[in-house]
Amino acid sequence: LSGPMLQNALMRGLQSSGMEVIDIGQAPTPMIYFAAVHLDAGSCVAVTGSHNPPEYNGLKVVAAGETLSADAIVDLRRRIVENDLLEGEGSLRKVDITQDYMERIITDMQIEKPLKLVVDCGNGVAGGVAPELLRKLGCEVTELYCDVDGTFPNHHPDPSKPENVVELKEMVLDLKADLGLAFDGDGDRLGVID
């Protein structure tokens, strides 16, 4: 819900420090990490609340190939509070890497036999990529809550909680599917039902 506002503020801030910003749009976190390497950026920021309730949001940061954590986060906060920031005139360009991302996965993976899958994206951002990718891999896909909606109207997008995969379990049984896949809100966690 606050994602677009945070994303725009972040992009403006990075540009004001002289950075070249590449906007790949709304994407699952693994695709954002892929983009950093694929586009030779080395760094990336995902605006995400992950598997938290919709009123929460945050940033996952990779700087120069390293995930920002612990001391680096404290240091970044100090620099922001002290206004110890670079200034410059950056740039912004939009790039759609969805097909490149899918092609990379398709090239790297082989499925021994076509699978019948039920895919529950929990209305998270994986819904924009996962069903199509799995079909391109040769799977038969039945979608469950794959329309992206940050209010998560059907269930909380945390596949580690049994109450969030009840419908998925039922559909796997009813359809005699090989597997059920449940993604979290930003697509970097996966629950598997067999």
Positions of PLM-derived features:
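Gly/Ser/Thr-enriched, mixed-charge loops and adjacent short helices
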Residues: N57-L175
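N-terminal small/polar loop signature for handling phosphorylated ligands or for N-terminal nucleophile
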Residues: L1-Y56, E103, L133-V192
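Conserved hydrophobic "DFG−1" position in protein kinase catalytic cores
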Residues: V61, V192-D194
